[in-house]
Amino acid sequence: ADPARLAAAVGYDAESLAKLPDGANMGLSCGNPVAIAALREGQTVVDLGSGGGFDVFQAGEKVKASGRVIGVDMTPEMLAKARKNIGQYRQRTGLDNVEFRLGEIECLPVPDNSVDVVLSNCVINLSPDKPKVWREIYRVLKSGGKVSVSDLALLKPLPDTVRDMAAALVGCVASAVLVEETKVLLEKAGFTSIVLTPKPDYVRNMQDWNDPLYKQIAETLPQGEEMADYVVSLSIEARK
């Protein structure tokens, strides 16, 4: 799908998108965790799986000069891309408050109790060890700190044929877990005030746009069923 169109569909406003460094929006969002977080000036924020810096740069504008945003990504290529974008971000916003660190979301390069808000956008579902990810998020958050995550989750288990497809994994689908299971993972990690809000429009949009990846997965589903019967974009909010 077209990155700008997808970003608009999941709730990013045109003004924020216009200020982004070129290429920061890679069309990999399944929600708008920055908006959900209601970020405030001076906060310290970490974005898990920050990619080209899409949510990091937008969060940076919200927390202003007295705040700090740290993007964590496990791929050196993404890290290089994001760091390259910092110069343009500074020019367009006048801010110097973002950084990108190499690391895995199961082992964050961030100190204990140091973060006000943790963001993530369509990344946690890809992790092979989700319980560890949520424990790590809990570890780095300050007491009272907030989780604001958009992720893909399952409404019902995927058929084996779909789960086995490489395309399904790339499309953030094969390793996604059930909505109820997501809540259990957060509870076990120690979170409170957990609010899970399904956003079915995201998957319907992907169907409408004939995204090649989603089309390929959809063609493998049992007859009469569609992606939106199985997969939903989930807004995840919680407190430490």
Please annotate each region the language model reported.
Residues 131-146:
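A short glycine-rich, Lys/Arg-flanked "PGG" loop and its adjoining helix->strand segment in the class I
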Residues 107-112, 128:
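Short conserved loop adjoining the S-adenosyl-L-methionine
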